Design a protein with these regions (language model features):
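A short, low-complexity linker immediately N-terminal to eukaryotic Hanks-type protein kinase catalytic domains
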Residues: 2-11
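Conserved hydrophobic "DFG−1" position in protein kinase catalytic cores
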Residues: 26, 38, 85, 95-97, ...
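Conserved hydrophobic core/spine positions of the Hanks-type protein kinase catalytic domain
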Residues: 123-130
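C-lobe/activation-segment region of protein kinase-like
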Residues: 133, 137, 149-231
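Catalytic-loop signature of eukaryotic-like protein kinases
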Residues: 140-147
Length: 231
């Protein structure tokens, strides 16, 4: 059956329709059973606010997504959505889903994560434990990076990942991947942690910074629990 796709946005109270992702173009089919990541600079979707416009960088993000989510699929298939197709030629990934993402469900129902998925903490912690076991550092942790399928939290957005053998990077070099709101939150936290934005920083430190930053989206005590995995 041929699926008809449309742009997928997050409908955020007080802001309206917002891009679901700053890097790729998010697409969803009409009955919300298939989600597509299209790694292309679609100006209609991003409306001139594109974060990644360099084709080489877009290609790098695409290859990271395919690499790391495939690792997860191979070792921990229950923790990522079923991959329907990897279209290497057109840089599209198709996933089996059941409705809108985890974050959007809370927005649509004006409720908490606990209301949507009572054991979400345990499930998300299992995902981070899998990352740790595979030597993956994942910095795209926003709650829109998860779908729920048959009561199981499924993780996506592996374009901003590195592994235990990756060379340190400077935060300045990846600022185009990070929203302005997130950047405003990150700088004081980098200062508090003694991280120089222009200096190569080990990935274990960046992972700690990511968990610290996403306390704006998740309970602080839960992020602190996740940080312990990378100590």
């Amino acid at each position: 059956m041929e699926h008809i796709f449309e742009y997928y946005y997050n409908n955020v109270p007080g802001k309206g329709l917002c891009r679901n992702n700053l890097i790729y173009t998010s697409l969803i089919n009409k009955d919300k059973t298939v989600f597509c990541q299209h790694y292309v600079n679609d100006t209609d979707y991003h409306k001139g606010q594109n974060q990644v416009v360099d084709p080489a960088l877009m290609d790098e993000k695409w290859l990271r997504e395919v690499n790391y989510i495939t690792q997860m699929r191979n070792k921990y298939p229950e923790l990522v959505p079923t991959i329907i197709k990897i279209d290497l030629e057109n840089r599209k990934l198709f996933f089996k889903i059941q409705g809108v993402d985890f974050w959007q469900q809370t927005l649509d129902n004006n409720c908490t994560y606990d209301d949507i998925l009572p054991n979400w903490r345990e499930q998300m912690l299992d995902i981070f434990k899998a990352h740790k076991a595979l030597g993956i550092y994942k910095y795209s942790l926003h709650p829109s990076s998860y779908f729920i399928v048959d009561g199981q939290l499924k993780s996506i957005n592996y374009f901003f990942c590195y592994n235990s053998t990756s060379a340190p990077i400077s935060l300045r070099s990846v600022m185009s991947h990070i929203s302005e709101d997130r950047q405003a939150d990150l700088f004081p936290k980098m200062l508090a942690l003694g991280i120089d934005v222009d200096a190569p920083t080990p990935h274990d430190q960046i992972q700690q910074l990511a968990f610290e930053s996403f306390k704006t989206n998740f309970p602080a005590d839960f992020m602190d629990e996740c940080k312990k995995l990378y100590v």
